[in-house]
Design a protein with these regions (language model features):
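Residue-centric detector for conserved, function-critical "anchor" positions
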Residues: 1-47, 52-68
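N-terminal alpha-helical segment
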Residues: 5, 58-59, 73, 187, ...
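Surface-exposed charge patches
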Residues: 11, 22, 79, 96, ...
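Residue-level signal for the short linker/turn that defines the boundary of a DNA-recognition helix
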Residues: 17-19, 72, 249
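Ca2+-coordinating acidic residues in Ca2+-binding motifs
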Residues: 33, 76, 93, 206, ...
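Basic, flexible linker segments flanking DNA-binding modules
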Residues: 38-127, 283-290
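RNase H-like DDE/DDD metal-dependent nuclease/strand-transfer catalytic core used by mobile genetic elements
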Residues: 88-91, 103-104, 117-145, 151-264
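C-terminal domain-tail junction helix/linker
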Residues: 212-216, 237-322
Length: 322
């Protein structure tokens, strides 16, 4: 029963000079409820809305975005809405609404990159990380996806399916990253370093000679400790989780699926460790402007919600009997 209906019943019963008990019985209202309403304990008065409650229009728009992008978590959805919808919604508020509507994304189990390389990078291209992961193509056997990631921004600079893990196959992908970034045009003292595991191709003389030729230093991860290269390991887990949902009968099909994921990961996936911006935002120096704009949107949202909810709280409740 709404507060307005309770107020109407109170007004009607108060006009009776006798037989209030009978009137309440006919209305199906317990006497205890009637006297509790009179004391204002249960909401015969309109309950005040919290000043920061999300507005109905904001909730409708948030749910529309959630249904358009069903794979986004409440954290990613919060960032997407703040960047594109003109209002902000917190991760916790978004989660409560998504849970109520049955739209909560399944929690993913991920390997944390806490034990990453001990010297943390402070700028893009200070260090790259490389690793490989295998994929099966039906009727074609196994392929190795060799990846080069910028450690600071987590941007994927190069990746390619290779038939083996030979030094030349690895060099081909590293050269792709070198060409994309113009690394050989950078003064030698400012060029990147490359972090890799101790695989045979990476520790070979051919690979070492190549790195020396392009002026890139080489860092080997601690043996039997894959989390030293944890960022690229975690990326590969995310990639395989998405790409391996379907079998592939041609290498070109797998290449297309990988390319689509890399484009999404680099340019559209909000990364928690990066402040809920994309790797491209960090690589190209856009992160601080984005975070500043988000604070402005959040401040404007707070002002609007306060005004909206305070206006509702001051509206009079009609208690006159009809």
């Amino acid at each position: 029963m709404s507060p307005g209906e309770k107020a109407t019943i109170l007004a009607r019963v108060e006009t009776l000079t006798w037989r209030k008990r009978k009137a309440l019985a006919e209305l199906g209202i317990a006497r205890s409820s009637y006297y509790r309403w009179r004391r204002g304990r249960s909401g015969a008065k309109e309950r005040k809305r919290p000043w920061n409650r999300i507005t109905p229009n904001e909730e409708r728009r948030m749910l529309a975005v959630a249904r358009e992008f069903p794979d986004l978590s409440s954290r990613q959805l919060s960032a997407l809405i703040t960047d594109n919808e003109g209002f902000a919604v917190s991760e916790s508020s978004g989660y409560r609404i998504l849970r109520r509507e049955g739209l909560v994304k399944r929690q993913e189990t991920q390997v944390m990159a806490a034990d990453e390389y001990h010297n943390k990078t402070r700028r893009p291209h200070q260090m790259w990380a490389t690793d490989a992961s295998y994929f099966r193509v039906v009727g074609w056997g196994y392929y190795y996806l060799v990846t080069v990631m910028d450690d600071y921004s987590r941007f994927i600079l190069g990746c390619k399916l290779q038939k083996d893990m030979s030094a030349n196959s690895l060099i081909e992908v590293v050269q792709e990253a070198v060409d994309a970034t113009g690394m050989t045009d950078v003064p030698v003292e400012h060029r990147t370093r490359l972090l890799s595991d101790n695989g045979a191709g990476y520790v070979s003389r051919v690979f070492r000679d190549y790195l020396r030729l392009v002026g890139i230093g080489h860092i080997l991860a601690a043996p039997f400790h894959s989390q030293t290269n944890g960022k690229v390991e975690r990326y590969q887990q995310s990639l395989k989780r998405e790409v391996n949902q379907l079998p592939y009968e041609l290498p070109s099909q797998l290449e297309r699926a990988i390319a689509d994921f890399v484009e999404y990961y680099n340019y559209r996936r909000y990364h928690k460790a990066l402040g809920n911006v994309t790797p491209a935002d960090v690589l190209y120096g856009r992160r601080e402007d984005i975070l500043r704009r988000r604070k402005e949107v959040q401040a404007q949202t707070i002002i609007h919600r306060r005004q909206y909810n305070q206006a509702l709280n001051t509206e009079p409740v009609n208690t006159a009997p009809s």
